């Protein structure tokens, strides 16, 4: 399966996983690591509140789960899919993991670090830049986040 054919299925799966995060009180963000054929190797959602660890963003957990499952310390040739533009911490993890392609949904002008904010992958401090594809299922992902925060205000 090519990455382009897998996009709707993967993003739909991530939106479901992000909804599960919201149902447990977490910010609705989910991430998946896929192989070159588009098969999901690892799937994760935000678990910061659940685990009591501020570092447990979906991207970090998905990358760690994929590395553990594969017995590798890098993910060359693998892709990361996420419902929200990654923050600086997650962008750093993506670079260190050597992710091949990054696909994300909603843009995050406040805390995002890929196309917004510090634009981590464009900085001299970044030693690996994945191919970046933003805006996948952007409307659905943004609406999910907006609904979550509207309930808490």
Where are these regions (language model features)?
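Short beta-strand scaffold segments in enzyme catalytic cores
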Residues: 29-38
């Amino acid at each position: 399966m090519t990455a382009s054919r897998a996009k709707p299925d993967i993003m739909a799966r991530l939106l479901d996983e992000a909804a599960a995060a919201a149902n447990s009180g977490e910010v609705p963000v989910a991430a998946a690591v896929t192989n070159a054929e588009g098969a999901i190797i690892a799937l994760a959602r935000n678990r910061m509140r659940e685990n009591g660890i501020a570092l447990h963003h979906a991207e970090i957990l998905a990358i760690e789960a994929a590395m553990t499952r594969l017995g590798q310390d890098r993910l060359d040739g693998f892709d990361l899919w996420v419902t929200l533009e990654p923050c600086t911490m997650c962008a750093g993890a993506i670079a260190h993991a050597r992710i091949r392609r990054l696909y994300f949904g909603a843009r995050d002008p406040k805390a995002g670090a890929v196309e917004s904010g510090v634009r981590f992958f464009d900085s001299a401090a970044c030693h690996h830049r994945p191919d970046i594809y933003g805006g996948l299922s952007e409307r659905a992902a943004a609406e999910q986040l907006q609904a979550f925060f509207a309930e808490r205000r």
